[in-house]
A protein has these predicted regions:
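Glycine-rich, phosphate-binding/catalytic loops in enzymes
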Residues: 22-23, 48-51, 79-80, 131-132, ...
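Beta-strand-turn-beta hairpins that frame and shape the catalytic cleft
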Residues: 1-3, 107-114, 187-193
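Active-site neighborhood of phospho(di)ester-bond hydrolases with catalytic His/Asp-centered motifs
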Residues: 6-7, 31-35, 40, 60-65, ...
Length: 254
């Protein structure tokens, strides 16, 4: 199985289309969406149409915090993120809201745990943003029975950057920053936590979309960066009347 891992799409249809096309060109035959399908971006309907169709064909799909926000926008929150949640809610029909509301927070594929945020209380939307947080995430996956093996691979989104935290000689997890397109051996015997990056809103100074491809048969993980028409995605945000900050973020990757 070659499993394409896509997270934090954020209603960016241009980026999603580019990543799906690239993943298929790399031999991806299964797909997993790790949450935050909507929010920030201008095309939640187009993105959900694609993801819902792919779920019907066997894709794994999880709920992220922005998906939950689109179902039930917060009241009294005047932040830019909350305002896009309210806008997104208004764009969706009842079937799309029902779809988002009933997505699971976690799922498993063989020895792999899929989760949007940390496996430590997934509903709290905690970030895996360093070695300590990765250790807490991995320990929670083992202790709570979310992973069915002693050396699980925990694959997460939420943080909008790509890092592999792998089990070293001791108990600690070591961070590794990948080179796009270069495969990394990922044996089942070594526990790890992987942040797969963001399809629809990169934040590391590179506007190219991110996803990862896990060849489970070969035990190899490859992180990818994919160019797409981020100018068109940014212009769509402006035309929708959403905050300029989110358009600028797509153009700069920050």
């Amino acid at each position: 199985m070659r499993l394409a891992l896509l997270s934090d799409l954020h209603a960016n249809l241009q980026a999603l289309d580019a990543c799906l096309s690239h993943a298929r060109s790399q031999g991806a035959d299964r797909f997993a969406f790790l949450g935050d399908l909507v929010g920030y971006g201008a095309d939640p309907v187009g993105v959900l149409d694609q993801v819902m169709a792919m779920q019907a064909q066997g894709a794994w799909v999880l709920q992220g915090n922005h998906d939950a926000m689109a179902v039930m926008p917060p009241t009294g929150d005047v932040s830019m993120g909350a305002s896009t949640g309210t806008w997104t809610h208004a764009q969706l029909n009842e079937a799309q809201r029902h779809f988002l509301a009933h997505l699971p927070l976690t799922d498993t594929v063989d020895h792999v745990l899929l989760v949007h945020a940390s496996a430590d209380k997934p509903e709290a939307w905690r970030y895996v943003d360093g070695e300590r947080a990765a250790r807490v995430c991995l320990d929670a996956a083992k202790a709570d029975g979310l992973a069915r093996v002693l050396a699980p691979h925990v694959l997460v989104g939420h943080v909008h950057h790509q890092t592999l935290y792998y089990q070293g000689a001791g108990r600690g997890l070591m961070p590794f920053k990948p080179t796009p397109g270069v495969g990394i051996p990922l044996p089942r015997s070594r526990a790890c936590v992987v942040t797969v990056g963001s399809v629809g809103q990169p934040r590391d100074g590179d506007p190219r979309a991110m996803y990862a491809l896990y060849d489970m048969s070969a035990g190899r993980l490859t992180f990818h960066r994919v160019p797409y028409d981020h100018a068109a995605a940014a212009q769509a945000i402006r035309q929708a009347g959403l905050p300029e900050h989110f358009a600028h973020r797509l153009e700069t990757g920050r």
